[in-house]
A protein has these predicted regions:
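Core structural elements
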Residues: 1-15
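Residue-level marker for well-ordered alpha-helical positions
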Residues: 5, 39, 86, 168-169
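Amphipathic, positively biased hydrophobic alpha-helical segments used for protein targeting
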Residues: 12-14, 52, 119-120, 131
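Internal maturation/activation junctions in enzymes
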Residues: 16-108, 179-182
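Catalytic alpha/beta core of large soluble enzyme barrels
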Residues: 77-82, 91-98, 103-184
Length: 184
């Protein structure tokens, strides 16, 4: 599945953090991410045909993840559809989807290294991390360090995982697979 990387940087540059997150911002971001992934796969189905077993998926029935999430999350962020979900659901019902599953949130260590991003949806453990692979040792500094160093929240500075858990709850509204959550 396609995941999210660099969430810590996104939070820092938007003046929010894991302990006291702007859940409306997270909701808006995750909704657009999910919508455009589903839309791209639905458009591919028009070009190349729907995936085998499309009629056995929720997508084939025109059902999207933001219709099946645990509604208790609405207590954190009221449900709002900013994107044209009605049109997308109609398209899914008519032409199907090319990929039966699209989204999964995992640590994304390799992708983060290649793109000089923070790991997936996780808070950084330090401003500089040392990562080792078969190719050698890599020292990686969080993106935008000089500009956002006072905005980043490091994992060990969190007093409680409550804000992090709330972020994960909001993200799950838009995901069709799973989330790898770490509450170190």
């Amino acid at each position: 599945g396609i995941g999210i990387i660099n969430l810590a940087f996104f939070l820092a540059k938007n003046d929010t953090n894991y302990s006291n997150p702007n859940l409306n911002l997270i909701d808006e971001y995750a909704e657009a991410w999910s919508y455009y992934l589903i839309k791209a796969s639905a458009d591919l189905a028009i070009e190349q045909g729907a995936c085998p077993g499309n009629n056995e998926t929720k997508y084939g029935d025109g059902i999207t993840p933001n219709q099946t999430y645990k509604k208790d999350v609405d207590d954190l962020v009221p449900h709002t559809e900013r994107m044209d979900w009605t049109g997308l659901r109609k398209q899914l019902s008519e032409t199907g989807i090319r990929n039966s599953t699209l989204m999964a949130l995992m640590p994304s260590e390799t992708s983060a290294q290649i793109s000089n991003s923070t790991n997936g949806i996780e808070p950084p453990r330090a401003f500089v991390s040392v990562k080792q692979s078969k190719d050698g040792v890599l020292k990686q500094v969080v993106p935008g360090f000089y500009r956002y160093k006072n905005k980043y929240e490091l994992l060990w500075d969190q007093k409680s995982p409550e804000g992090y858990i709330k972020i994960m709850a909001v993200l799950q509204k838009y995901i069709d697979q799973g989330i790898s959550v770490n509450t170190s």
